[in-house]
Amino acid sequence: AAQVLLEASLSIGTVLTRDNRYFISKAGWFVLKDKMARVNMDFTQEICYQGMFDLEKTLQTGKPEGLKVFGDWPTIYEGLSSLPSIAQEKWFAFDHYYSDNSFTEALNTVFAKPVKKLLDVGGNTGRWAEQCVNHNAEVEVTIMDLPQQIGLMREATKGKNGADRIHAHPANLLDPEIPFPTGFDAIWMSQFLDCFTEEQATSILQRAAASMNENTSLYIMEPFWDRQRYETAAYCLTMTSLYFTAMANGNSK
């Protein structure tokens, strides 16, 4: 068992051999020690792997055919609260890793001018909302998301500092008849719009615009593959898009 694994590792460069002994390479060290590598590999194993068997069918139908390995939902977002515990853990580890690293700079941008009420669209488990209420002692944050996500958010923020200033507005954002709530100084969308088709994203933005007044600011943060500094980052994003197509909703990146 050790021999076949070491020989495979030798071929992919995670171990090296010298004087009939194996030792770890720099790439192997990063696989073991680098948090991003672990987050990505765990995510691929627990969320993506089995469902990717149905990628071709997904491309033909425009539906997340791979999602059936976990349950019968129109998109993965309705099913997040019902995923197997290990899959749910790795989903959120992946999701939080990439959002958490951007919070400090984003907070400075959003709160560069006074914000008393902020609408967090697609706020998921409330990580950004928590950051906002900890950063600013007065801001009230409302999370607009699916009812299932709102339930996860309530559990995640329960008893935490500022949780009394985090509110919920459950809604299916893909329903073009659902209006956005009004009266906000800022609207925040992070790693959100690229989860939908161009038509769906346009509908969301049109309804957001209709809810805004002349003083409302709209902030959108998205990772675009063709705006990356490093080639490897672009590679990772385009490959992750294949997962989103097969597993998330069948038509997104």
Regions found by a protein language model. Give the residues of each.
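Conserved Class I S-adenosyl-L-methionine-dependent methyltransferase catalytic core
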Residues: A2-K116
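Alpha-helical subdomain
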Residues: A1-S11, L16-T17, A112-K113, K117-K253
